[in-house]
Curated annotation (Swiss-Prot):
Zn(2+) binds at H94, H103, H112, D115. Encoded by a cryptic bacteriophage. One of its GO terms (biological process) is removal of superoxide radicals. Destroys radicals which are normally produced within the cells and which are toxic to biological systems. It comes from the Bacteria. Monomer. Binds 1 copper ion per subunit. Binds 1 zinc ion per subunit. This is Superoxide dismutase [Cu-Zn] 1.
């Protein structure tokens, strides 16, 4: 009996450690023109057979749907553009390793790899709905980049406005290597 229980516990621990290897957690902070702001929560990313699953645990956000992307650089620092300090500009653009130059959303393989489904924020300012990114298969594809939340929605097109017509960068998290 002792050995059976010990075997079950050991098996459970091995399973948990294997699951931990297939997830990563990204701390998200307000993106400010003066630098990184307050922590607003975290996003857990898990590998699934269907793509990467992004599970937000965020608060203090504006209700509605917001553009959500993987950006090229592992930075959330501001940068200068047209003489103005822009929040999280050092994160670069949407992850686009194939250099498509097209914003076509998470389901079209001819656009940015970093285009993710829209982030849904509840009326109370929390975001908890998981998002599936079917084109991203491995956590290694994310490492050394950043996650970005934009003000406003995303139409998954470059028309009528570039990059889905989303607004300013307002939350960012660096994905460590």
């Amino acid at each position: 009996m002792k050995y059976t229980i010990l075997s079950l516990v050991a098996g459970a621990l091995i399973s948990c450690s294997a699951m931990a290897e297939n997830t990563l957690t990204v701390k998200m902070n307000d993106a400010l023109s003066s630098g990184t702001g307050e922590n607003i929560g975290e996003i857990t990313v898990s590998e699934t057979p269907y793509g990467l699953l992004f599970t937000p645990h965020l608060n203090g956000l504006t209700p509605g749907i917001h553009g959500f992307h993987v950006h090229t650089n592992p930075s959330c620092m501001p940068g200068m553009k047209d003489g103005k300090e822009v929040p999280a500009l050092m994160a670069g653009g949407h992850l686009d390793p194939e250099k498509t130059g097209k914003h076509l959303g998470p389901y079209n393989d001819k656009g940015h790899l970093g285009d993710l489904p829209g982030l849904v924020v509840n009326a109370d300012g929390t975001a908890t709905y998981p998002l599936l990114a079917p084109r991203l298969k491995s956590l290694s594809e994310l490492k050394g980049h950043s996650l970005m939340i934009h003000k406003g929605g995303d139409n998954y097109s470059d028309k009528p406005a570039p990059l889905g017509g989303g607004g300013a960068r307002f939350a960012c998290g660096v994905i460590e290597k």
